[in-house]
Amino acid sequence: MRRLLIVGLVALSCGLIARATEEAAEAVPSFDEGVVPEAILQAAIEARDLPLGERMERISRPMLGMPYLVDAVGEGKLPDVDPPARYDVYDCLTFVEEVLALALPADPRSAPMIRNQLRYTGGEMDYTARRHFMLEQWIPENIESGWLKDITAEFGETHLIEKQVTPRTWSAWKHRRKFQLADHELPTGHYALPVLSLDAAIEAADQIPPGALILTVRRSRDHIPIIVTHVGFVVPSDDVPRMRHATKMGRRVVRDERLAWYFDHVRWYDWWQVAVSYTHLRAH
């Protein structure tokens, strides 16, 4: 039987949210004012006193059915002139970032500050500071900065997926040219993620709290720097555990899946073995 792995569960630190929210009250970028659609803004306002997982579900509910489009956001300036936020299309990461940015602060007008803290090193909106790569940047830097906490071990025996990334790894990668970064700006080093086996993940599925992020991870290959390929989150459900994500599968939209179905679907990918990760976010 093929083996699917589930990577580190993460929780959000409360103190950093509060600090970023206070800063955002004084420094909301003007280019984001008025961008959030009324239905999403109203959902964020009405849900702000709910537990975090429920807030994420309510806020993202109006996004269901929105088209999937990869790399639709940028800094509004060269080298990526796309706007910092869009609500008509999403890829998997921008969907998660936007939901978190709206769910975490008490006032959704603070969303740009929260988004920038999650997306950029130091919170500075600059292409070279963007956390382009999940394994090498987005996950470890958000853990180091205090936003995230790995809680994988709470749900079973963990294993490590390890990856050595060198300049040669980047030069051999066929998608290297898509990133407007100098060679020295690409992350290198040894990276590792704690994981659960698929069997352990399925067994623990009912224990995973709403708001937990799900990271899909492929088996490491020497010539490919990317192993984390997808992200979504667990939503509250009255019946079976479900995830919500912006996906290329099927109709290429934001949609919900039964976790059991999703695990069964990805376990049989023949062209690359896949892995999944849950991450939990602590409400403040």
Where are these regions (language model features)?
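Conserved small/polar residues in nucleotide/adenosyl-binding loops
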Residues: 279-284
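Bacterial N-terminal signal peptides
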Residues: 7-15
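Acidic/His-rich structured neighborhood in mature extracellular/periplasmic domains
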Residues: 71-191, 209, 245
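Cationic-aromatic interfacial patches
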Residues: 24-94
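Catalytic-site beta-strand/loop segments enriched in glycine and acidic/polar residues
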Residues: 60, 64, 68-79, 186-228
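Positively charged n-region of N-terminal signal peptides that target proteins for export
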Residues: 1-3
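C-terminal soluble interaction/assembly domains
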Residues: 217-276
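Boundary at the C-terminal end of the N-terminal hydrophobic targeting segment
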Residues: 18-24
